UniProtKB/Swiss-Prot annotation:
Family classification: Belongs to the universal ribosomal protein uL6 family.
Gene: rplF
Lineage: Bacteria, Bacillati, Mycoplasmatota, Mollicutes, Entomoplasmatales
Subunit-level organization: Part of the 50S ribosomal subunit.
Pfam families the UniProt entry points to: Ribosomal_L6 (PF00347)
InterPro entries, alphabetized: Ribosomal_uL6-like, Ribosomal_uL6-like_a/b-dom_sf, Ribosomal_uL6_a/b-dom, Ribosomal_uL6_bac-type, Ribosomal_uL6_CS
Alphabetical GO biological process terms: cytoplasmic translation
Organism of origin: Mesoplasma florum (strain ATCC 33453 / NBRC 100688 / NCTC 11704 / L1) (Acholeplasma florum)
GO molecular function: rRNA binding; structural constituent of ribosome
GO cellular component: cytosolic large ribosomal subunit
Function of the molecule: This protein binds to the 23S rRNA, and is important in its secondary structure. It is located near the subunit interface in the base of the L7/L12 stalk, and near the tRNA binding site of the peptidyltransferase center.
Protein's name in the database: Large ribosomal subunit protein uL6
Source species, domain of life: Bacteria
Length: 180
C-alpha cells in the first residue's frame, strides 16, 4: 500500500495556508490563490511551515482519499509558488498555431481553422508557430487545457503528424509493404 498520505509537506517561503472548519483549504502565494474543499474523513493540520494530513479510519476508500488529498495539497503548494507548464509541439505541413487575444487559432489540415477559447487563469504563448506553451497555477486545469488542444489532432503513428506533448515519444509504424 502506498504511503503518500503520510508525507509531511513543507510550505514554501511566501506561501500562506489556511484551513476552514469545513475542510476547505486556501493556499495563497506569489502567483495567486487556490481554494479546494476536501473530504471530512481527512484532517488537515498546519503546524509552522509544515502541512500534514491524517485519516479518521482504516477503510480502503479513506486510505485512497488520504493519498489523493496529500498529492492535491502538494500540487496547490507548488502551483502558487512556482506554477505549472506544459509544452505542445505541432508537426505537419501547414499545421500552425497563432494567438488572437483570448483565443488560440489552430490550422490543423481541416477545411476550417480550429478556434480554442483559453480559460481564465491560464496563460498560453506561441513562441513559434509550431509550439504552444500552456502555464498556470492549477495543475489540473493546465493539464486539461493541454489535453483538449492535443485532442484536436492527435499524433498519428505513420508520419508523426499532429499535436504532441514536447516530452512525448510517438511510436512509429512502418507503412504497407508493396506486394509483387
Amino acid at each position: 500500500m502506498s504511503r503518500i498520505g503520510n508525507r509531511i509537506l513543507t510550505i514554501p517561503a511566501g506561501v500562506e495556508v489556511s484551513v476552514a472548519s469545513d475542510n476547505t483549504v486556501t493556499v495563497k502565494g506569489s502567483k495567486g490563490t487556490l481554494t479546494q474543499k476536501f473530504a471530512e474523513v481527512i484532517t488537515i493540520k498546519v503546524e509552522g511551515a509544515e502541512l500534514s494530513t491524517t485519516r479518521a479510519n482504516e477503510i480502503k476508500h479513506t486510505k485512497q482519499l488520504h493519498g489523493t488529498t496529500n498529492s492535491l495539497l502538494q500540487g496547490m503548494l507548488i502551483g502558487v509558488s512556482e506554477g505549472f507548464k506544459k509544452t505542445l509541439d505541432i508537426n505537419g505541413v501547414g499545421y500552425r498555431a497563432a494567438l488572437a487575444g483570448s483565443k488560440l487559432n489552430l490550422s490543423l489540415g481541416y477545411s476550417h481553422p480550429v478556434e480554442y477559447t483559453i480559460p481564465q487563469g491560464i496563460t498560453v504563448e506561441c513562441p513559434k508557430p509550431t509550439q504552444i506553451i500552456i502555464s498556470g497555477i492549477d495543475k489540473q486545469v493546465v493539464g486539461q487545457v493541454a489535453a483538449e488542444i492535443r485532442s484536436y489532432r492527435r499524433p498519428e503513428p505513420y508520419k508523426g503528424k499532429g499535436i504532441k506533448y514536447s516530452d512525448e515519444i510517438i511510436i512509429r509504424k512502418e507503412g504497407k509493404a508493396a506486394g509483387k
